[in-house]
């Protein structure tokens, strides 16, 4: 009994490992991304580190990297040949040339006989992309339409449009939709003549100082006309069409992602990968279950 009491006291006295909440990460389409997985405060030496990816809620989970922590090697990453995911020497997950299909939830786990860090670091990765179009107002003046969208679709209320270090100058209108934001720029009234001839750089900024830069062509009209309000169907129809196309593209990309994950799951039905759980399982002693017999069932 004394040995059992000391064992329970030792287990209960172990400090809890601190962990961060789910982190939202933005990456621009085509850029690289590194997802860290730092070492936990305590390890037994028999843990295996794994990285998992779930592209959408309710979809199958894919194992993208698996290595034993106690046996470091020169090339610990073992990604698939067609994959652009690589496990670095510090156990971070490196994504090269991000695509829309790379969006989703990533998490690393360290599982052993004594310690089980099942959801040690969790990231929600969104891929940011931009598009640029031209529109013509009712009076014939040319307007620029800038579109920022994310996959998977999420609210973009925190997106800001900037020109240099300040707000965008001129006659501008911004619109927000599900997973997309749009900026309509028409030649402004009262701008100095040099400003009207210089090309501008407009940035769509999301949290973490990530963003997309748009280059506007120099204006050739010395006296730009004010963009007419929505008195004609030209600009309004183009805005509606762009928002519809953006949402349709998001739906198609998510459908392709789900189809690919189901196809991969059918090829690995015998493999069982742990699904993501919102709670964090930290320390677990598998020998504790053998210390006392199970309680008898009562009716």
UniProtKB/Swiss-Prot annotation:
Q: Which sites does the entry annotate for glycosylation? A: 90
The record gives the membrane topology as: Single-pass type I membrane protein
Question: Residues of the signal sequence?
Answer: 1-19
Q: InterPro entries of this UniProt entry?
A: Ig-like_dom, Ig-like_dom_sf, Ig-like_fold, Ig_sub, Ig_V-set, LY6G6d/LY6G6f
- TM annotation in the entry: 238-258
Which keywords does UniProt give here?
Cell membrane, Disulfide bond, Glycoprotein, Immunoglobulin domain, Membrane, Phosphoprotein, Signal, Transmembrane, Transmembrane helix
Q: Report domain Ig-like V-type positions.
A: 20-124
Fetch the SUPFAM superfamilies from UniProt. Answer: Immunoglobulin
Outline which residue ranges sit on the Cytoplasmic face.
Answer: 259-299
Subunit notes for this chain? Homodimer; disulfide-linked. Interacts with GRB2 and GRB7 in a phosphorylation-dependent manner.
- What is the name attached to this protein's record? Lymphocyte antigen 6 complex locus protein G6f
Source organism:
Bos taurus
């Amino acid at each position: 009994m004394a040995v059992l009491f000391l064992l329970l006291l030792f287990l209960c006295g172990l400090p809890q490992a601190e962990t961060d909440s789910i982190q939202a990460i933005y990456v621009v389409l085509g850029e690289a991304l590194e997802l860290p997985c730092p070492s936990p405060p305590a390890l037994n030496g028999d843990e295996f580190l794994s990285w998992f990816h779930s592209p959408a809620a309710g979809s199958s989970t894919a194992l993208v990297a698996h290595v034993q922590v106690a046996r470091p090697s020169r090339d610990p990453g073992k990604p698939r040949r067609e994959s652009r995911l690589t496990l670095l020497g510090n156990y971070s997950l490196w994504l090269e040339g991000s695509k829309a299909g790379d969006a989703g939830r990533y998490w690393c786990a360290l599982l052993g006989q004594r310690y089980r860090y099942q959801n040690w670091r969790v990231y929600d990765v969104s891929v940011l992309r931009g598009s640029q179009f031209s529109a013509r107002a009712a009076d014939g003046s040319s307007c620029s339409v800038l579109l920022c969208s994310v996959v998977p679709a999420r609210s973009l209320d925190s997106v800001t449009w900037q020109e240099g270090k300040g707000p965008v100058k001129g006659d501008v209108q911004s619109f927000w939709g599900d997973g997309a934001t749009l900026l309509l720029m028409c030649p402004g009234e009262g701008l100095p003549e040099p400003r009207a001839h210089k090309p501008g750089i407009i940035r769509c900024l999301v949290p973490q100082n990530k963003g997309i830069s748009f280059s506007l062509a120099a204006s050739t009209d010395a006296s730009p006309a004010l963009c007419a309000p929505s008195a004609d169907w030209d600009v309004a129809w183009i805005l509606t069409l762009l928002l519809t196309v953006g949402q349709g593209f998001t739906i198609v990309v998510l459908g392709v992602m789900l189809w690919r994950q189901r196809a991969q799951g059918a090829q690995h039905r015998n493999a069982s990968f742990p699904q993501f759980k919102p709670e964090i399982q930290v320390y677990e002693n598998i020998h504790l279950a053998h210390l006392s017999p199970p309680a008898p069932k009562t009716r």
